[in-house]
């Protein structure tokens, strides 16, 4: 029993990747909203284990329609995942990932894209390593001018988190991104602060007030300007099948969203964005999204 307990406890000690720092707060602001879009997402899985994901959306302002198709197959015995992607810009993508095979906690991904219309090609090698108290990442983005190297590291100890993210452009021989982050998280509370390139400062707080209510606060400021961005968001679970979300920022933009699970595998989301400074002037946005999963 002791061994089983250690195995279950280990994942709780692994810090998130740098990109996922503050994710809980961002999700309250982003999920459950889809202003200005009519969107359809469909996910299915074949008997052979191949996963199909299709997504289509129409912009209500421009009328532009975009879509994506993705197929994924997992070869669990060897820790391999094969992914094929296509979008309406006629860009083809292939991704091969191998995880926990070379060593425990290491994931390698080979990602390529090709556009037949323009002949443009791109390639990227991604790597991540996560163990107790540490999460490392290193990506190499290949380009004809010279590869760009993206690196990140997050360290965690007793709820405290510290992270660093950088990008080195070999063509320019200089750092093009230099970010720092510090945070703290417990089961129902998360605090995140970050500094991007020494000019952008941000912070967020996530609080699970009770079992049905999640709240979030976001603050951002850019040096050299008098512009401070501030927002508050909340999500309330009405019942096991329905939830309502709301958010407002210092620009008086008010967003509301309602999500209803119509039946298992069928989810409907309605959302609206209202400009509080010009309620009678129009320009407000609505959105509709339908998710199907089988």
From Swiss-Prot:
Residue numbers bearing the Phosphothreonine modification: 118
GO molecular function: ATP binding; ceramide binding; cholesterol binding; oxysterol binding; phosphatidylcholine binding; phospholipid scramblase activity; porin activity; voltage-gated monoatomic anion channel activity
Gene Ontology terms: cellular component: acrosomal vesicle; membrane; membrane raft; mitochondrial membrane; mitochondrial nucleoid; mitochondrial outer membrane; mitochondrion; nucleus
Keyword Transferase in annotation: no
Positions where N-acetylalanine occurs in the chain: 2
Protein origin, superkingdom: Eukaryota
Protein family per UniProt: Belongs to the eukaryotic mitochondrial porin family.
Function: Non-selective voltage-gated ion channel that mediates the transport of anions and cations through the mitochondrion outer membrane and plasma membrane. The channel adopts an open conformation at zero mV and a closed conformation at both positive and negative potentials. There are two populations of channels; the main that functions in a lower open-state conductance with lower ion selectivity, that switch, in a voltage-dependent manner, from the open to a low-conducting 'closed' state and the other that has a normal ion selectivity in the typical high conductance, 'open' state.
Protein name: Non-selective voltage-gated ion channel VDAC2
